[in-house]
Amino acid sequence: MRIAKIANTRGVDSDARKHHHAGWMLLGCMVISVFLCYGQIRNSKALLAVCLLAFLGFVVLSCGRNAVFAVLLYFLPWSPLLRLDNKSVSFFTIALLAVCLVYCLKDHLSFNTYQSVLAFFLVLLTLAAKLWQGNPIRNNYLFFVCMLFLLPSVVEKSNAVSFKEATLFFAAGVVMAALIAQQTAGLPNISKYINVQSYLSITRRSGFYGDPNFYAAHITACLAGVQLLLSREEKRVHQLALLALMVLLIYCGLLSASKSFVLTTAGLFLAWVPILLEKGHRTSKFRLLLGIMCAGAVIVSSSAFEPLFEVIDERFSYAANISQLTTKRTDLWMDYLNEFAHNVSLTLLGHGYTSVTLHGWASHNTIIQSVYQFGLLGAPLLFIWVALTLKRVRQGLKDSRSNWRYTLLMLVGVVIPWIALDILFFDEFFLLPVYVVLGSHYSKE
């Protein structure tokens, strides 16, 4: 009995130390992001250089504390500001590559055979496509190739990742970036990073991103994670804190006036129902349902949400047909499909991962973008590579059993918005699928 008590005490002390370290890591992230924003406002190259170096050092430091995934998710909404000017490469991309190199060096450059072979053939296909289409090799392509070879070595360490910690860091980063961007969007040195769309009586915020839908996709991904934490939380104080966080995320999402955010959020709450109906502690479940109803009442009745609902209502009022509902995305999709039907070489090989678009317009659909960039020969190789990478994530977890309800919720929050986005050129393509797998295997930590 005494041994059991000692073991239990040690476990509690260990958890307390982990939470203590996580708290300091989160505080460090917040301090860096605040000074980063101030440096951009003042256009101080010296301060920006210090912040960017501090960011890189902080990310490398977090590798040794098994908190790198959480730290990267925190800074994901800040990535547009993580650069010396709006034309240079984001240091977030550099940090992601640095993390992969650190872990690969720890493993003495060991590579997975199957994924390396897939990556090799994908590189050959893209180089052939570039040669055929006359497209140059640029830095974003080199980064993509490096990630194809290096990322599989990193995801094997996912057993040390805390989904709860990652979600809370992600939420803190999203909320801070959204609210600070809302207040600083009019400043000249910040406005060059932000695209605030205003027409008629509609104003659309996008955090520090140039696309409101891209910004909203971060929020739906994070919201799915918070809902998952809520469904497993039994402590009253923690439930209240998570409910407040959920309300904040919905507020930040509505700032985008994004129709896809509204539809995805509705899908999230529908996918949440089977999880809430799972067997569990009745008192805790009842308290949670009561809290959700109270949160809904706050959202509906709050004066802070009223103008946001008016903007959303006005946006939907213009949607007389499917083309207007999707903001002419369906027209773009038909243009791309028509191009595939008349251009055999493009359909088979693609453009070889370039910034080339059809008539200067992006496809606004990740699947169409995959075919346009990699062709029907390369796109399946890419999807198989992703599937094998996520399989390695799953195998590295303590509990390899997934919950289909959790998987559905995470897929709705993360993947559904990609139907209206071109995600392949962004760091989210490598990070967020891992987040989905971590959520689908989440158990009370």
Could you tell me what each predicted segment is?
Residues R2-Y103, A128-A129, V414-I416:
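N-terminal signal-anchor transmembrane segment
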Residues V273, L376-V415:
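Hydrophobic transmembrane alpha-helices and their immediate junctions
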Residues L36-A46, L82-F91, W132-F143, Y209-A216, ...:
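Helix-loop-helix junctions and helix-breaking kinks within/between transmembrane helices
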Residues Y199-R205, S284-L288, I299-M334, S355-L358:
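Flexible juxtamembrane loops connecting transmembrane helices in multi-pass membrane enzymes
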Residues A54-V59, A95-F111, L118-Q182, V273, ...:
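Transmembrane alpha-helical segments and their membrane-water interfaces
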Residues C29-F35, L270, T407-P417, I423-E445:
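Transmembrane alpha-helices of multi-pass inner-membrane enzymes
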Residues Y318-L377, V393-K398:
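Long extracytoplasmic/lumenal interhelical loops at the membrane interface
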Residues A54, T126, K164-Y193, Y209-I275, ...:
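Alpha-helical transmembrane segments of multi-pass inner-membrane proteins
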